[in-house]
Amino acid sequence: MFSFVDLRLLLLLAATALLTHGQEEGQVEGQDEDIPPITCVQNGLRYHDRDVWKPEPCRICVCDNGKVLCDDVICDETKNCPGAEVPEGECCPVCPDGSESPTDQETTGVEGPKGDTGPRGPRGPAGPPGRDGIPGQPGLPGPPGPPGPPGPPGLGGNFAPQLSYGYDEKSTGGISVPGPMGPSGPRGLPGPPGAPGPQGFQGPPGEPGEPGASGPMGPRGPPGPPGKNGDDGEAGKPGRPGERGPPGPQGARGLPGTAGLPGMKGHRGFSGLDGAKGDAGPAGPKGEPGSPGENGAPGQMGPRGLPGERGRPGAPGPAGARGNDGATGAAGPPGPTGPAGPPGFPGAVGAKGEAGPQGPRGSEGPQGVRGEPGPPGPAGAAGPAGNPGADGQPGAKGANGAPGIAGAPGFPGARGPSGPQGPGGPPGPKGNSGEPGAPGSKGDTGAKGEPGPVGVQGPPGPAGEEGKRGARGEPGPTGLPGPPGERGGPGSRGFPGADGVAGPKGPAGERGSPGPAGPKGSPGEAGRPGEAGLPGAKGLTGSPGSPGPDGKTGPPGPAGQDGRPGPPGPPGARGQAGVMGFPGPKGAAGEPGKAGERGVPGPPGAVGPAGKDGEAGAQGPPGPAGPAGERGEQGPAGSPGFQGLPGPAGPPGEAGKPGEQGVPGDLGAPGPSGARGERGFPGERGVQGPPGPAGPRGANGAPGNDGAKGDAGAPGAPGSQGAPGLQGMPGERGAAGLPGPKGDRGDAGPKGADGSPGKDGVRGLTGPIGPPGPAGAPGDKGESGPSGPAGPTGARGAPGDRGEPGPPGPAGFAGPPGADGQPGAKGEPGDAGAKGDAGPPGPAGPAGPPGPIGNVGAPGAKGARGSAGPPGATGFPGAAGRVGPPGPSGNAGPPGPPGPAGKEGGKGPRGETGPAGRPGEVGPPGPPGPAGEKGSPGADGPAGAPGTPGPQGIAGQRGVVGLPGQRGERGFPGLPGPSGEPGKQGPSGASGERGPPGPMGPPGLAGPPGESGREGAPGAEGSPGRDGSPGAKGDRGETGPAGPPGAPGAPGAPGPVGPAGKSGDRGETGPAGPAGPVGPVGARGPAGPQGPRGDKGETGEQGDRGIKGHRGFSGLQGPPGPPGSPGEQGPSGASGPAGPRGPPGSAGAPGKDGLNGLPGPIGPPGPRGRTGDAGPVGPPGPPGPPGPPGPPSAGFDFSFLPQPPQEKAHDGGRYYRADDANVVRDRDLEVDTTLKSLSQQIENIRSPEGSRKNPARTCRDLKMCHSDWKSGEYWIDPNQGCNLDAIKVFCNMETGETCVYPTQPSVAQKNWYISKNPKDKRHVWFGESMTDGFQFEYGGQGSDPADVAIQLTFLRLMSTEASQNITYHCKNSVAYMDQQTGNLKKALLLQGSNEIEIRAEGNSRFTYSVTVDGCTSHTGAWGKTVIEYKTTKTSRLPIIDVAPLDVGAPDQEFGFDVGPVCFL
């Protein structure tokens, strides 16, 4: 029989052999790397190491290092659950609703063993709908819409010829409607030449015939009596010019001459003076950070901070000294039966048992996940007929129906293509010149243009500064539990030994039940930025870029050569609306259009009814590992595991307690003598020995040495037990005990100290997109960033929304039916139709043969959201997105005041992050930076102010004679001349195109006189002939009696107003006419443009203050963007008013030889030529002039023009006006009056008066034209155009400033604002955040704010400087300087009209000044502070809102006086 020691030795040897064998196997495995991972096979199925499965519902197996270990499932008792059910595929019954009687819930039994894995739960409900997806690409354009409804009926009117089928009193009273117009017939052949024209006017008498030949000389007769005086001889040749006479008296003032032709282009002027200093360039790039300033003076002691977070547990203290043993307690009651002891060591391997009987079939497992769809089944039998199918293709066109009633005349058709060129007709007689038409009224504003094309995606902007550090991350997953410790052998408790060396890592214990969630780890340091990702997919097309600025007007090009006659011009502007024509004939059917492009695939249809369950598919391969689940709750303790193999030697344990007294061993062999001991105590007295024999008495000797030691006596009886000895020294460390059974799981340890940051890990795959975080609190509004570089011109944007329909135009004349147009271009695909309702599922029909691919159906409506699918495989990492555009810079917080330097304290525990401090004040501006590179030249400055008028120049020479005036009115018909002979009938020539007039030929010879014809009817009016040569002098007629003066004729109907002539040169100023009567009020103008942006809404409640993030590193400055493409050429600006005349320049160098002079005046008419042959019939003339105007409506009335006094001035031009001066004299006066009135109007335009009817552009213009006028209120119209939107302003005539008043100059003085948190002082905008507050508007009472906004925009453009002041009335409210602190932290903020903030301190360009400061402390009395702001950036004024800071208490009141904004 083995002793206990031998048994232990044997077990140790066995464990060593097993370990060695395992290591050898491991080495062999390590050498053969191709051996697959450890798996197990059961029932033909292969499982991986550590896999757990249930071959039967009540049996559970695990693959452990290639062996299958199985165990029965032990079910918990189901108490208080009468209706417990065993789910399919499960072993243990469960309560159906999970409810137990409430009375039993309080009795808690002993915690049972760990239950099995529960069955897979039913599929959860569909999640809530996701957020809206990224907007899709714009859809293809829809098809053209259906034709609109017919427009309103056209105008009726005085177009009698077209409406001659109208009302007929003699008929039955109805209106006879003509039938539809037939189709146009084919073009006819050219007609024969027309009949000869009517008889021409009587020709002038022929020249006297040549004298006949002289007869023979007769004899001389007697002298006759003196004859009568002969007729006057013909005028002799003109004599030589006489000498120059003395100058005559000054003639009456002539009419202004017509404008001479424009002179040649002058020489290039000298360079102008340097322009005004340009605007400041944009702010330079941010300078390098300055060196840190010196420490400031110590601040006041801050308030006591909040208590910090609880610190981390400290390191364990040193072990205390061992306490004294306590007194022995009384014996306790007997304890409960202890748990079963640990399993024994593994027994020897038993013989293999016989196969057990087949187990019973397990209960049915739970329904599996729905399988993949099976392969398609064979075609079923033919089902019954399905529901009616969808509509078929449209049928063939039906026969024409009977013609309907003629519809209302249609709108004019689109203009057809030009027909073939017809043969030229014979030339018609020349028509009269039409009267000039009236100037058209100003057209309505055109409809808003289509939005521009979408811009091309701009290049990525420069990298923004690194953003603020993100919010604290979610807690990381809990780390894996450490390996279980080995169990030490029991011993008596020794003093703690020195720490042993850490032993090697033990094999992994069985998986423990999940522990409680560990504490939140502290965030690690930020990893290095990841490598740049692949480029992302192309983004959506960007929004359209704004149009670039207008380019400067280019120089005029040289004149081109005359071009060939151009093709026919495009259709002219739309004419006046005509009467509706008859309906045109129906056009021929157009060719079928091309097939449309294949439509886009429709969206998924509605979810159909669920199909039948498919057969179970084959087991799919294991899916990829899912993301780690959240940590489960702590499970119940599991049942004890199988006995493990002995572990390796553990580290030396602590010294055990002293063992009990052992049995005494056998006596050992005697050792060698020890060194001599110290003298012992005297032994007890020995027993008296027997007496020795008597020796002889010796002499007394010296005392001898001690004798040898006697033999030991017999052992005495054992003594009684002695008192316990002192505690011995600790024994040597015992050998390691065998590993104990697995201990219970320890409690979660305290949170460890933060580890040092790990090295950067390998770049991981891109994780799945997380759920969207909550919206952050709105940040403070940043200051406007500098304008970015202009992006390249964008591609054409999608067409904008259709504008609202304009008002229906007047109906046009009916156009002739156009010819059939070409087939239209292929239409764009139409909008997707709405999806129809899902029909009920029909019975399954037989599988038909595959039909041809049908047209793509219209996309259906978006289907309902499907239930969430199973997680897909992990995708490849998505490409990294492009760097986003830089965010707007936040407001720079002013640095806080530096605190006093404290003594170096010990490092305190980490406190919670405190709330962000208030922004400090802005520091003083730094020293000026180095000079920047020279900037590119600025845009041309505004034109300088015109110089003062120069001295009066020398009078110019008299202008050349003007071009001949317009053709005179038609004269009265002359008396019939003496009858001439009719000419011969000329042959009718072929009708040629009319050639250009040839040069005038020399006068022809006189023809023989013709016979007298009969008196012809007066012919049609010919064009007036040249003046005839003077006829032969007739006999003197007898003087007729003077006729009575004729009665004045009735005034003729006024002709239509002629077009505005080109403006003539400025006439000399006429005498001022009397003021005309006030004109009628004009019609209301069209609706103005959209009003200005409304007031901002009230500020929302203040959000919680976010935690201040770490400051990011400054990003490198991005490269400059590419230059923008040049903008389209802008429209020419309106011509400015003429400046005053400059001083005469110095005499220039002599010019080149001048061009030939103008042609001289027309010479006297030559002798009359002989009558020419009759010309061919002319082509038909152009349409005659319009008939006389209808009854007067709102006609053009010249009565508003001031009538000059009707002096009878000498009329120098009378000889050229007409043959009968008396008839025309009244007309001349009217023309002269109109001319004078026009010149007066032109004078008003060039030198406006500032009245409502004649507003100036700015007060500066008024001051320049009328320097002696006084300051006061005048009307100005900076945007020119119609004067109905002129505004009333105050003109300061000393300075030329234009001052616009606010519509409400004063704001009541009262308490406007009560703060919910009076200690939280911040600026509150009066118009934006205060109840009943408003933003300031300008323009005076009754003006339209939209008009004023436009006029102010123009006024800013024409000004270089603006200023305004505001008076703040206060009671207990600081406006600027705080008397208590001496600083400006409580000063008001102003908001300019470009929404920039104007402050009391900081950058000097954005600071205001104060002229009176009476609001520096809380005195309880009213005071005032006057604020003034002057700037060259005119877009910042006027001020539209004010934000005080020192308000909000019930006793704090304020009000404003808003001054005018003045532009210069």
Swiss-Prot record:
Segments of this protein annotated with the region Nonhelical region (N-terminal): 162-178
GO biological process assignments: blood vessel development; bone trabecula formation; cartilage development involved in endochondral bone morphogenesis; cellular response to amino acid stimulus; cellular response to epidermal growth factor stimulus; cellular response to fibroblast growth factor stimulus; cellular response to fluoride; cellular response to glucose stimulus
Effect of residue 266 to E: In OI1 and OIEDS1; affects collagen fibril organization; collagen dermal fibrils in patients have smaller diameters than in age-matched controls
Region: Nonhelical region (C-terminal), residue numbers: 1193-1218
Biased composition (Gly residues): 485-494
Effect of residue 200 to V: In OI1; patient diagnosed with OI1/OI4
Effect of residue 1195 to C: In OI1; mild form
Domain VWFC stretches: 38-96
Mutagenesis or variant effect for residue 242 to D: Found in a patient with unclassified osteogenesis imperfecta; likely pathogenic
Effect seen on changing residue 1219 to N: Found in a patient with mild osteogenesis imperfecta and increased bone mineral density; results in defective type I procollagen processing; incorporation of the immature procollagen into the matrix leads to increased bone matrix mineralization and altered collagen fibril structure
Outcome, altering residue 383 to C: In OI4, OI2 and OI3
PTM sites of type 4-hydroxyproline: 190, 193, 196, 205, 208, 211, 226, 241, 247, 256, 262, 289, 292, 298, 307, 313, 334, 343, 346, 373, 376, 388, 394, 403, 409, 412, 427, 436, 439, 451, 460, 475, 481, 490, 496, 514, 523, 529, 535, 544, 547, 556, 565, 571, 583, 592, 601, 604, 622, 640, 646, 652, 658, 664, 670, 682, 691, 703, 715, 718, 724, 730, 739, 757, 772, 778, 799, 805, 808, 817, 823, 841, 850, 859, 871, 877, 886, 895, 898, 919, 928, 937, 946, 964, 973, 976, 982, 997, 1003, 1009, 1018, 1024, 1045, 1048, 1051, 1120, 1123, 1126, 1144, 1159, 1165, 1180, 1183, 1186, 1189, 1192
Motif stretch (Cell attachment site): 745-747, 1093-1095
Consequence of changing residue 263 to V: In OI1; mild form
Protein name per UniProt: Collagen alpha-1(I) chain
Species in which this protein is naturally found: Homo sapiens (Human)
